[in-house]
UniProtKB/Swiss-Prot annotation:
Subunit text: Homotrimer.
Disulfide bridge partners, by residue number: none
NCBIfam families: ispF (TIGR00151)
InterPro entries hit by this protein: MECDP_synthase, MECDP_synthase_CS, MECDP_synthase_sf
Name the UniProt record assigns to this protein: 2-C-methyl-D-erythritol 2,4-cyclodiphosphate synthase
Site (Transition state stabilizer) location in chain: H38, T137
Organism: Bordetella bronchiseptica (strain ATCC BAA-588 / NCTC 13252 / RB50)
Membrane-traversing stretches: none
Pfam family, one: YgbB
Gene name per UniProt: ispF
Catalytic activity: 4-CDP-2-C-methyl-D-erythritol 2-phosphate = 2-C-methyl-D-erythritol 2,4-cyclic diphosphate + CMP
Molecular-function GO term, any one: metal ion binding
Amino acid sequence: MNIPFRVGQGFDVHALVEGRPLIIGGVTIAHTHGLLGHSDADVLLHAVTDALLGGAGLGDIGRHFPDTDQAYRGADSRVLLRAAFDKVRAAGWAPVNVDATIHAQAPKIGPHAAAMVANIAADLALDAGAVNIKAKTNEGLGYLGRKEGIAANVVVLLARAG
């Protein structure tokens, strides 16, 4: 059966720590803490990357860009996202739209959402209207509510290319 669409789902979470920049959706946000990770720890772009790869049946971000590989230490997640996009296109798929939710007690995501949308749209060759970003707090509950980390959930619709 030749199904013309696939859905990919991605999730990522990183701890907030002192002494690192906070980068979400390729946007550096002024904040007291940043996300801990092997790369730049961009929780949103990691979830988008996982959703793309998963939807195309290509595994996940760890398979293609392992945190055990020093080549990816401090890597710009936009570079990783574009590389994943190339792999997805080579497999015969193209993203149609991206819907993301960022879970963060702080900082406020709203003032930065348009820049995040623009980055993702540019990296995936999409119209900005095909990328949606929502933000939720955890109402003070759990590790996210205690400001110990930030998480992101992403859904991507893929269509057969060409």
